[in-house]
Swiss-Prot record:
InterPro entries: CENP-X
Organism: Pongo abelii
Gene responsible for this protein: CENPX
Keyword Cell division belongs to the record: yes
Known partners and oligomeric status: Heterodimer with CENPX, sometimes called MHF; this interaction stabilizes both partners. MHF heterodimers can assemble to form tetrameric structures. MHF also coassemble with CENPT-CENPW heterodimers at centromeres to form the tetrameric CENP-T-W-S-X complex. Forms a discrete complex with FANCM and CENPX, called FANCM-MHF; this interaction, probably mediated by direct binding between CENPS and FANCM, leads to synergistic activation of double-stranded DNA binding and strongly stimulates FANCM-mediated DNA remodeling.
Family assignment from sequence similarity: Belongs to the CENP-X/MHF2 family.
Sample GO molecular function, one term: DNA binding
Primary role: DNA-binding component of the Fanconi anemia (FA) core complex. Required for the normal activation of the FA pathway, leading to monoubiquitination of the FANCI-FANCD2 complex in response to DNA damage, cellular resistance to DNA cross-linking drugs, and prevention of chromosomal breakage. In complex with CENPS (MHF heterodimer), crucial cofactor for FANCM in both binding and ATP-dependent remodeling of DNA. Stabilizes FANCM. In complex with CENPS and FANCM (but not other FANC proteins), rapidly recruited to blocked forks and promotes gene conversion at blocked replication forks.
Main localization category: nucleus
Protein name from the UniProt record: Centromere protein X
Highest taxon in the source lineage: Eukaryota
Subcellular location: Nucleus; Chromosome, Centromere; Chromosome, Centromere, Kinetochore
């Protein structure tokens, strides 16, 4: 059984649109499996960013996560992915 918010995530249409914004050739297509994989990857990336942001805020004794904490964890997060 999955936890709270398990049904939330990125819509395939949104991810497809984001990918196509960066393709040089307009005829480039993305298979359904590749699209599903990108949806899952983005979901994991965002959750991991949130968790690391919370840990950084706790280390700084901050009561809430701010963009400053996310900016501090982003370089290592990008290297890990």
């Amino acid at each position: 059984m999955e936890g709270p918010g398990a049904g939330s995530g990125f819509r395939k249409e949104l991810v497809s649109r984001l990918l196509h914004l960066h393709f040089k050739d307009d005829k480039t297509k993305v298979s359904g499996d590749a699209l599903q994989l990108m949806v899952e990857l983005l979901k994991v990336f965002v959750v991991e960013a949130a968790v690391r942001g919370v840990r950084q805020a706790q280390a700084e004794d901050a009561l809430r996560v701010d963009v400053d904490q996310l900016e501090k964890v982003l370089p290592q997060l990008l290297l890990d992915f």
